[in-house]
Amino acid sequence: MSRRHSAEKREVLPDPKFGNIVITKFMNSVMYAGKKSVAEGIVYGALGIIETKTKQNPLGVFEQALENVMPTIEVRSRRVGGATYQVPVEVRSTRRQALGIRWLISAARERNEKTMTERLSAELLDASNNRGNAVKKREDVHRMAEANRAFSHYRW
């Protein structure tokens, strides 16, 4: 970490279709090699598939999926007298969102559907119904924190 200046937070503009900042952050995470238009096509395509499958507002399904994936607590390593403890700590809201987005996308990339659009829509639908690999990842992190609850007094 830098000792001088902390990095300034960049302002993220809302996406053109839904006017939502979280969708823009999601799109930027899907993006490879600066290809924003490809990422836009993937995300909007996935939301379109969700709308046709569920007949619901795709933004609501997306927000529910993200809410079901975001962790509230995680473990961080802390060295105390030669031993390393996994200490459970609460997750800040910005990190919660970033982790949720990251886990959703990585879970979608590991799926077996043909296109990324189909994978992403399937993972979002699963996550909104509390299923899928992204939700499993969140539960694993929570389980680790629960198992190491005895070390919570080492917090910093």
From Swiss-Prot:
Keywords: Ribonucleoprotein, Ribosomal protein, RNA-binding, rRNA-binding, tRNA-binding. This is Small ribosomal subunit protein uS7. GO terms for cellular component: cytosolic small ribosomal subunit; ribosome. One of the primary rRNA binding proteins, it binds directly to 16S rRNA where it nucleates assembly of the head domain of the 30S subunit. Is located at the subunit interface close to the decoding center, probably blocks exit of the E-site tRNA. GO terms for molecular function: mRNA binding; rRNA binding; structural constituent of ribosome; tRNA binding. Gene3D superfamilies: Ribosomal protein S7 domain (1.10.455.10). GO terms for biological process: ribosomal small subunit assembly; translation. The keyword Metal-binding does not apply. Belongs to the universal ribosomal protein uS7 family. CDD domains: uS7_Bacteria. The keyword Coiled coil does not apply. It comes from Bradyrhizobium diazoefficiens (strain JCM 10833 / BCRC 13528 / IAM 13628 / NBRC 14792 / USDA 110). Pfam families: Ribosomal_S7. Part of the 30S ribosomal subunit. Contacts proteins S9 and S11.
